[in-house]
Amino acid sequence: MERVYTTPLLDKLGIRPGMRVALIDIDDPEIRRLIAERTTDLTEGEPKPETDVVLFGAEAPADLEPLPMLAPRIRPNGAIWVVSRKGKSATLRYEEILDVAKAAGLIDNKVAAFSATHTAVRFVIPVALRPKSPAPGRRR
């Protein structure tokens, strides 16, 4: 039985109203429009500090060079989605993306279809490496 996927793209990517989002090398007017409908905190290029979600387009191994510099720009519970071609037209292997992300201290924890031609892999800071927050009701 074929499953019908109806989850909107921004929901798959975890982009909620009011989030700080950055687009890097994503040339897609439709995704810009969808994000702008959901949040006003959208930048293109270098992410602002404490960014919630970065969408980072990469087509070749050399395109991954900025990835280690993005990790410090996201919130501790934020995410960097690496968007690349999928299938036979892929010009970047999953292992190549994973190697660069791991060297930057990130782990992968989700893959999503970004479009008919592109896939997205989510990278996050491991929970064990995130700053500890005070227990609810307690102040530091």
Describe the predicted segments one by one.
Residues 1-34:
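N-terminal, charge-rich interaction modules
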Residues 41-51:
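Short acidic low-complexity segments
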Residues 64-96:
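Mid-chain, well-packed structural core segment of small domains
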Residues 37-43, 58-69:
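Glycine-rich, highly charged phosphate/nucleotide-binding loops
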Residues 127-140:
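Flexible, glycine-/basic-rich loop-and-beta segments that form/coincide
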Residues 87-90, 95-100, 104-128:
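Long, charge-dense
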Residues 24-25, 54-59, 82-85:
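Conserved beta-strand segments of the P-loop GTPase G domain that flank and frequently precede/overlap
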